[in-house]
Amino acid sequence: GSSQTRIFSEGQLLLEEKTVVAVDNTNDDILGFGTDAIIHYHTEPQRVRLEWPVKNGAMIDYYYTRGILSYFLKKGLKHSLSRPEIVMSIPSGLSSVARHALIDATMHAGAAKVYLVSSSAAAIFGQGISLGGSDVTLSVVMGRDITDCGLFSCGGIVAQEQLAFGGNSINEEIQAYVRDSLKII
């Protein structure tokens, strides 16, 4: 996602780190990914900048995304001898071009096969909710930049919607309210 990357295998969380890359300001070399990137930045903030290669749930930098995926796959699946098949959750509004680019980056990062599923559907599956009956299930997934909503019934998707509103928007509104209320500059 825009903020966090999580890798699960057989229901077990193998990795959870920030989706961020540390880059050297002097030569644009990659210095680290995830937690390592944050550490590099806090150690030398004048020399290091942080790049977030995913924005609004979409990849905005192929090179950084491929690098971070490769690093996270090796770190999260360090005991695996084979190339993994990967199921990735993505925003429902992601374009077909963006989907293809993400599959390509993931394959080049070391995946044997890549399957894409909407974030709202992934949340349903992750909770173990059965979609076989006629009951209607609403799934709302709020990320850093976007909120993904899905309505499911009779084993399928009835409707999906992506909103350009996420956790960062809420944080910014709270900060603005506190600033305005307390007259803080």
What kind of feature is each model-predicted range?
Residues 2-144, 152-185:
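Nucleotide/phosphate-binding catalytic cleft detector across ATP-hydrolyzing
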